[in-house]
């Protein structure tokens, strides 16, 4: 039955987000959740967030005049012995006139509410952007072009591409809690320990833990498909699947460490973000067919460009330096220490070890107290204990607008 209404603004819901992921959600959902992921306090009783810049998440489909809203505190708890225990708060963004505080005007004072506005925003106006229905739409990644929240807050990594069947896996990494901005702060990078490689390794480890396990039969099938469709299963070396590494010809990527560790090497996951998809390879490559005695040979020439201002540019350059024609080498920080070898010369008075002198016995020290024992924990034990603090020392991935923007792990 045809509708009697003419086509109007109210009948054509406008998209809310344009982030290169799944199709943007529409206005008018029945849910009351924020469109965006939350920022999370690093510690209990943290002060309300302060922002470098406007504090309004990037949304290309919202006019400048509508770029205003509020961050709302959400208390969080985890189950524990004797009842639930509080954990650091989460803060969610809503546009003015939407969400749990829809009845407030911009700037109205209320506990747990922080108002933000972009330059040029009309804070007297109210938004018609609605809220998110969690049953229909995933939350969207936070991006701040003019700077993010202060160092007391962080947010989890959410890939820009994901389907409803697989909600994002929050991955951790010891990086700054601010996303790289497109201007002065864009060039800031964390130390070498917290760079792209460590983050990528953590992502794939978390996904393997939470995902379905790969059986031995499945792994064998993955490693022995048609050559162009093979993938390296967990526990396999690269040369078990794709043959020995070479120099100057096909199969020249990977050093000895990468070959031995396979996909456990975080550099593999990092570089896969630059590898073209099947469609990109087919339609974006220079394809050269050539008939040979053994069959048809297809050559695909594809170029991926990583801009020099990309936040991960230096990391990609380092990985390429290590792994292109890298057979027979290892990263400098991963070179095995040479084992000491016993001398093959016959013992003489000149090279025989002198008799050891008897050392005076040392007095036994009293046992360390509990607080002293804690100080003697190994680095691995300290790291494990830190993880038990439940987000007390969170790690964050902020990819920003990098070469990874249109890919997901």
UniProtKB/Swiss-Prot annotation:
Region spans: Disordered: 1-84, 122-145, 164-194, 238-258, 327-409
CDD domains xrefs: CoV_N-CTD (cd21595), CoV_N-NTD (cd21554)
Disulphide bridges, residue numbers: 320-323
One GO MF term attached to the UniProt entry: RNA binding
Biased composition (Basic and acidic residues): 180-192, 247-258, 368-384
Every CoV N CTD domain range: 215-331
PROSITE patterns referenced in this protein's UniProt entry, alphabetically: COV_N_CTD, COV_N_NTD
Family: Belongs to the gammacoronavirus nucleocapsid protein family.
Listed name of the protein: Nucleoprotein
Organism for this UniProt entry: Turkey coronavirus (strain NC95) (TCoV)
Taxonomic path: Viruses, Riboviria, Orthornavirae, Pisuviricota, Pisoniviricetes
Gene name for this UniProt entry: N
């Amino acid at each position: 039955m045809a509708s009697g209404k003419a086509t109007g603004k109210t009948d054509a819901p406008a998209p809310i987000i344009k982030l290169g992921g799944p199709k943007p959600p529409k206005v008018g959902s029945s849910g009351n959740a924020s469109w965006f992921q939350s920022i999370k306090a690093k510690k209990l009783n943290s002060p309300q967030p302060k922002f470098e810049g406007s504090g309004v998440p990037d949304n290309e489909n919202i006019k400048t005049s509508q770029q205003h809203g509020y961050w709302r505190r959400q208390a969080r708890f985890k189950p524990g012995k004797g009842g639930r225990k509080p954990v650091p708060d989460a803060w969610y963004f809503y546009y003015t006139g939407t969400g749990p505080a829809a009845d407030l005007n911009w700037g109205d004072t209320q506990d747990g509410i922080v108002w933000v506005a972009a330059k040029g925003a009309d804070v007297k106006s109210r938004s018609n952007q609605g809220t998110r229905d969690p049953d229909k739409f995933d939350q969207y990644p936070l991006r701040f072009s003019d700077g993010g929240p202060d160092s007391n807050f962080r947010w989890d990594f959410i890939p820009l591409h994901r389907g409803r069947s697989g909600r994002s896996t929050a991955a951790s990494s010891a990086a700054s809690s601010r996303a790289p901005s497109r201007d002065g702060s864009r060039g800031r990078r964390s130390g070498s320990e917290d760079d792209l490689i460590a983050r990528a390794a953590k992502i794939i480890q978390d996904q393997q833990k939470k995902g379905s396990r790969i059986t031995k039969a499945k792994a064998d099938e993955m490693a022995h498909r048609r050559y162009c469709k093979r993938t390296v299963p967990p526990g396999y070396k690269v040369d078990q699947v794709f043959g020995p590494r070479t120099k100057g010809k096909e199969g020249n990527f990977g050093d000895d460490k990468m070959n031995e560790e396979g996909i456990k090497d975080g550099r593999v996951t990092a570089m896969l973000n630059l590898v073209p998809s099947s469609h990109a390879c087919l339609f974006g490559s220079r394809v050269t067919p050539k008939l040979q005695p053994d069959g048809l040979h297809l050559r695909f020439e594809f170029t991926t460009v990583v801009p020099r201002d990309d936040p991960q540019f230096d990391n990609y350059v380092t990985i390429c330096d290590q792994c292109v024609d890298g057979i027979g080498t290892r990263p400098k920080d991963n070179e095995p220490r040479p084992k000491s070898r016993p001398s093959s010369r016959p013992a003489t008075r000149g090279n025989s070890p002198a008799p050891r002198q008897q050392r005076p016995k040392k007095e036994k020290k009293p046992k360390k107290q509990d607080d002293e024992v804690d100080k003697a924990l190994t680095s691995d034990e300290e790291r494990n204990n830190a993880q038990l603090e439940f987000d007390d020392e969170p790690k964050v991935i902020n990819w920003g607008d990098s070469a990874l923007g249109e890919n997901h792990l």
